């Protein structure tokens, strides 16, 4: 078969399209017992994916594809995050370029701009994920701001609010004056910065408010906040200030009226208080207390019932409480206040310091601690905190009660024939010497069976797959006494079959059970079978039994050290500020009653009919106004859905929101009729029509209004909360929200908890912890079993990738240049647990060469495969030792890869298949086969001709057999090239390699003796090749060599594989000698001394001289580099990449020098 050159772009486009069109990765109704579910960490709709996203998606896809090939029903849910602050920030920057701001546009128009941006970003990300080759189920795609998720968010908020776990309070928050919103503690990034510590003198006053001439000096880094001071605090154990506690001080500069948060006037004469939280060794030991602008001061202010005076507003400017400094920027005010203090001789001194300053994680603005009214989740409450710690620290127990049936068959010296309804029409005859008990399936009459014919490898593989598939089922067979089993086919006795029993997932040999107590054996499968009794009748009595299974559920962090990282944070948990003063996001579902002050939380639970629920959700989502026309509703519901444009918004409501198909008419006329009936008082007199009085009609505006009423006083005078929820609030619901919560859906029952979460360490607190909190609270179960925490992707010098530095590597550029398979394999092989990835573009180029190697190996196999290859297989010659060696290595590689992936050892798994394919299969086995592949058969000798053809067929059979399985092992890492090549193989069956079985180690294919022989052969050939290279003998030049050995094993290997040694080491001869011949250079290979004859090939003296010159040059260069790296000035001032480059040069020089010295030692010998 002809196979053209490798073209990554062509095959990637072809197979991406194929996978999506075939919906290969969609499982309509997954089986809970076989499922493997994963939810993608939803990328933000803020732009395109970076290399960190590519790594995350690759690591997930490797595991998902591997699990799918192991027989699991994999459901990997894709989706996107609306990313409140981040997305709003991106759109605001775009508006700024046009000279506009969101405040000028207003909320409604600004949100329209965001909705114009979001589809562009989402489509770009979806395209990138598709190019990367991820095997997600696009039919289940979700968005954190879609109708179903928005409904789930409102439900979660209401539930927590009614449970007293959401509250609204005055609190000190991290305020970003640029984004004008509160930030959680996790959204603040701290940086060490140079600053000043100002020492300010506060005059002490007497009981009449007159200065006493005494001062108390306080130290502060933020003099601008002193205008809001309401106390001075000292430690009660500080002897320096005990005499001042209880007295008052005059606040410097302030000679104007100040008001607290409730509008009460606050004096400029402030108390001196004692509090143990004051550090005696900071500054002077006396500190100013500004409860409205400092977290510790806030706590101290609450303890001592101090007034809260705000002096900085939401924009970072001084407010009316700042008097003479009002209107100034906070930093401008700082300078002015310091100057005034200096002028009034109240500034004692100024010290330069380095301190930690908090910045907004998004825009890098210095945050302003500020008291404001915010919404919080009480995550410190034991109802949330305790279980979130327990599921990670010790796990939780889950009990499940199952009902089974026991069928007790009383038989004695009796044969039972079990006809199997399988292809082949075989029967199993069970000859029972004693009573047998069958403990069988879920319903009466369902008998478990075990069977595979001897010698049929395909059925053996099928049986093993069944064993894996059913090992966790509640099917068991208990035998008392030892049955004898034979296989009947076509009513004639044939050779007794082999049989496979599985116990605890392990293969058992039935013969070894003799004399032991009865075993409970888990069967390979299930099936209905009639019992055909050949001698006597038997009585089977079904009996129901109940079995209670208890299993532990625990969230496991990988690597394990992240468990401590998580728990340390959880034990010191603070309540979570969830309100954000922005416009893009989930608007808090709270309506304040202007008449009675009641706080109302509305969800669609407040409505009965599907129409009303939908209209409420459209209003709450901002898709229509509270006043609307029926035409507006119809237009929205009939428009294509944002996430799934193949369906309408109404279809999305039916499938993803309510999960049932209401038969509803949503035309404008039908809605108008519905509203009219609802508001008509006469409707009460109409049989079958109920009145709800939900809608009102405004004849002037010609619009209908959905009426919301206060749940306390019934007033319609309500105002909705303007803040939106923190993005992470909706993201915390992701693992169960995507499966339809709060509805009790089949997906939710079958796919939750999910099996794996792959994420970066930087969002363990932001996201992972909160998913655990919300999952355990709402679902009463863990959200996922395994959390794999991957490291950061850095540049080759270990620096974080940054546009500022200019070291960002775009995954799309890499795919364009080297292909998605090269990108994926590079990221996987570099992923070592607990170690950051240092990424250089040459790495991708290297693994593109690997893809080429795979392609060319397949070309070699296919181009040498005749059209009648399959027909020739029955006549092939027995396997040679090199055939058995490569099959053994294949099985060992399969075992190593499986074990590595079970433990998320990506690098180890990738290295194993890389070494096998590149070295064992390509560099060695293909070379071994060339003698048989290209050997010409004599035309005049039919017997010899048949022998040559049959040996060629054996080589081709082994090449195909190993290639097909190796492609399957490679597939999770390199899906495109493996899919393309697999379909070209004659022994590949099925619509996709991704649905083929992942190879397992087969003990029957381990040929240890042949493996040892071929490994010894490789060592001998490698030793000869190495010395040839050192002697600089041309690869095409044939030379003589000889050997001496005391090892009988090595002697036999050389004799058996003499032709391979001559061909692959390019030798004229290789004979055994008793002593070293003259004019030879010696090398060793374990127990064998090898002599290469150099006469006529090498000028030894000249070669030694050449290597000595090379050694001298290396020593000089190494001396230069060492001198540079020992220079402290160079190490401090040179850029990181320059220092790293010099270190790499040093390492390379040392390796080269070592090699040259080893060669010289050999040559001089």
UniProtKB/Swiss-Prot annotation:
Q: Indicate yes or no for the key word Methyltransferase.
A: no
Q: Record-annotated residues binding ATP?
A: 803
One GO BP annotation is: valyl-tRNA aminoacylation
What's a Gene Ontology MF term here?
Answer: ATP binding
Which Pfam family name is an example for this entry? tRNA-synt_1
Q: Which reaction does it catalyse?
A: tRNA(Val) + L-valine + ATP = L-valyl-tRNA(Val) + AMP + diphosphate
Q: What do we know about how this protein assembles, alone or with others?
A: Monomer.
Task: Outline what the protein does.
Answer: Catalyzes the attachment of valine to tRNA(Val). As ValRS can inadvertently accommodate and process structurally similar amino acids such as threonine, to avoid such errors, it has a 'posttransfer' editing activity that hydrolyzes mischarged Thr-tRNA(Val) in a tRNA-dependent manner.
Query: What is the protein's given name?
Result: Valine--tRNA ligase
The species this protein belongs to is: Aquifex aeolicus (strain VF5)
């Amino acid at each position: 078969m002809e196979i053209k050159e490798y073209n990554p772009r062509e095959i990637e486009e072809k197979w991406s399209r194929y996978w999506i069109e075939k919906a290969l990765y969609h499982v309509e109704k997954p089986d809970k017992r076989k499922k493997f579910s994963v939810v993608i960490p939803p990328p933000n709709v803020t732009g395109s994916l970076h290399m960190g996203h590519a790594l995350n998606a690759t690591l997930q896809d490797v595991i998902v594809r591997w699990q799918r090939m192991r027989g699991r029903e994999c459901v990997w849910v894709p989706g996107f995050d609306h990313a409140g602050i981040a997305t709003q920030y991106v759109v605001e920057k775009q508006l700024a370029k046009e000279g506009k701001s969101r405040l000028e546009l207003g909320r409604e128009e600004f949100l329209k701009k965001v909705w114009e941006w979001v589809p562009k970003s989402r489509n770009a990300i979806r395209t990138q994920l598709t190019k990367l080759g991820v095997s997600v189920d696009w039919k289940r795609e979700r968005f954190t701001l879609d109708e179903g998720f928005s409904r789930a968010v409102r439900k979660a908020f209401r539930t927590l609010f009614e449970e007293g776990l959401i509250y609204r309070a005055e609190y000190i928050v991290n305020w970003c004056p640029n984004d004008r919103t509160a930030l959680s503690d996790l959204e603040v990034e701290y940086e060490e910065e140079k600053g000043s510590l100002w020492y300010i003198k506060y005059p002490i006053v007497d009981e009449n408010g007159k200065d006493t001439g005494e001062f108390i000096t306080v130290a502060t880094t933020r003099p601008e906040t002193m205008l809001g001071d309401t106390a001075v605090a000292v430690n009660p154990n500080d002897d320096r200030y005990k005499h001042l506690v209880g007295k008052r001080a005059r606040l410097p500069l302030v000679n104007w009226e100040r008001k607290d948060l409730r509008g009460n006037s606050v004096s400029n004469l402030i108390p001196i208080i004692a509090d143990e939280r004051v550090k005696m060794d900071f500054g002077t030991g006396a500190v100013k207390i500004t409860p409205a602008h400092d977290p510790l001061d806030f706590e101290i202010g609450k303890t001592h019932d101090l007034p809260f005076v705000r002096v900085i507003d939401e924009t970072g400017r001084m407010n009316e409480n700042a008097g003479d400094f009002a209107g100034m920027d906070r930093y401008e005010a700082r300078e002015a206040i310091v100057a005034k203090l200096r002028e009034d001789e109240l500034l004692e001194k100024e010290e330069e310091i380095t301190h930690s300053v908090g910045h907004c994680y998004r825009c890098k603005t210095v945050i302003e601690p500020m008291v404001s009214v915010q919404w919080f989740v009480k995550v410190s409450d034991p109802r949330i905190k305790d279980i979130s710690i327990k599921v990670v620290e010790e796990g939780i127990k889950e009990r499940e009660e199952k009902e089974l049936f026991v069928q007790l068959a009383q038989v004695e010296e009796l044969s039972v024939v079990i006809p199997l309804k399988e292809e082949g029409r075989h029967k199993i005859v069970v000859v029972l010497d004693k009573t047998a008990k069958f403990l069988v399936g879920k319903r009466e009459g369902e008998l478990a069976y075990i069977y595979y014919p001897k010698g049929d490898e395909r059925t053996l593989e099928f049986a093993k797959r069944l064993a894996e598939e059913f090992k966790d089922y509640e099917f068991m067979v208990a035998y008392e006494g030892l049955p004898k089993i034979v296989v009947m086919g076509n009513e004639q006795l044939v050779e007794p079959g082999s049989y496979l029993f599985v116990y605890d997932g392990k293969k058992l040999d039935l013969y070894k059970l003799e004399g032991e107590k009865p075993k409970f054996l888990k069967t390979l499968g299930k099936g209905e079978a009639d019992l055909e009794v050949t001698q006597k009748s038997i009585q089977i009595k079904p009996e129901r039994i109940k079995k209670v299974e208890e299993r532990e559920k625990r969230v496991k962090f990988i690597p394990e050290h992240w468990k401590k990282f998580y728990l340390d944070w959880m034990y010191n948990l603070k309540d979570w500020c969830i309100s954000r003063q922005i416009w893009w996001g989930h608007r808090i579902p709270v309506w304040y009653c202007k008449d009675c002050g009641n706080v109302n939380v509305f969800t669609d639970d407040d409505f009965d009919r599907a129409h009303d629920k939908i209209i409420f959700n459209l209003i709450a989502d901002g898709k229509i106004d509270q006043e609307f026309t029926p035409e507006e509703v119809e237009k929205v519901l009939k428009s294509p859905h944002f996430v799934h444009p193949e369906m309408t918004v109404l279809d999305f409501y039916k499938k993803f929101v309510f999960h049932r198909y209401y038969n509803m008419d949503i035309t404008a006329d039908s809605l108008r009729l519905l509203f009219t009936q609802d508001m008509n008082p006469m409707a009460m007199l109409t049989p079958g029509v109920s009145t709800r009085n939900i809608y009102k009609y405004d004849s002037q505006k010609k619009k209908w209004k959905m009426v919301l009423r206060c749940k306390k006083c019934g007033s319609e005078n309500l105002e909705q909360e303007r803040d939106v929820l923190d993005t992470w609030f909706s993201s915390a619901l992701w693992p169960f929200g995507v499966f339809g919560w709060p509805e009790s859906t089949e997906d939710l029952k079958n796919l939750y908890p999910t099996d794996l979460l792959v994420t970066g360490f930087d969002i363990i607190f932001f996201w992972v912890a909160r998913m655990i909190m919300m999952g355990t609270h709402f679902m009463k179960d863990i959200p996922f079993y395994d959390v794999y925490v991957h490291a950061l992707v850095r540049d080759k010098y270990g620096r974080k990738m940054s546009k500022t530095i200019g070291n960002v590597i775009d995954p799309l550029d890499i795919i364009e240049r080297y292909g998605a398979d090269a990108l994926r394999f590079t990221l996987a092989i570099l992923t070592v647990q607990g170690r950051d990835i240092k990424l250089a573009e040459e790495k991708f180029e290297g693994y593109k060469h690997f893809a080429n190697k795979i392609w060319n190996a397949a070309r070699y196999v296919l181009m040498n495969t005749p059209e009648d290859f399959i027909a020739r297989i029955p006549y092939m010659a027995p396997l040679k030792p090199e055939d058995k060696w490569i099959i053994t290595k294949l099985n060992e590689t399969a075992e190593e890869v499986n074990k590595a992936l079970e433990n998320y050892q990506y690098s180890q798994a990738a290295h194993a298949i890389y070494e096998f394919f590149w070295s064992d299969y390509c560099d060695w086995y293909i070379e071994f086969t060339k003698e048989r592949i290209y050997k010409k058969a004599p035309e005049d000798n039919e017997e010899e001709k048949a022998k040559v053809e049959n040996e060629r067929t054996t080589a081709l059979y082994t090449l195909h057999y190993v290639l097909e399985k190796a492609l399957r092992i490679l597939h999770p890492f390199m899906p495109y090239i493996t899919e393309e090549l697999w379909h070209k193989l004659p022994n590949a069956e099925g619509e996709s390699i991704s649905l083929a079985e992942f190879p397992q180690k087969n003990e029957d294919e381990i040929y240890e003796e042949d493996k040892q022989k071929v490994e010894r052969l490789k060592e001998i050939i490698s030793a000869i090749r190495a010395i040839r290279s050192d002697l600089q003998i041309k690869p095409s030049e044939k030379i003589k060599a000889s050997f001496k050995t005391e090892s009988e094993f090595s002697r036999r290997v050389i004799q058996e594989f003499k032709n391979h040694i001559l061909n692959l080491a390019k030798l004229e001869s290789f004979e055994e000698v008793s002593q070293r011949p003259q004019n030879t250079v010696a090398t060793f290979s374990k127990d064998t001394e090898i002599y290469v004859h150099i006469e006529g090939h090498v000028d030894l003296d000249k070669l030694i001289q050449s290597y000595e010159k090379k050694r001298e040059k290396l020593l000089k260069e190494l001396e230069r580099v060492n001198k540079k790296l020992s220079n402290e000035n160079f190490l401090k001032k040179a850029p990181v990449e320059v220092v790293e480059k010099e270190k790499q040069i040093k390492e390379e020089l040392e390796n080269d020098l070592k090699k040259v010295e080893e060669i010289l030692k050999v040559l001089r010998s």
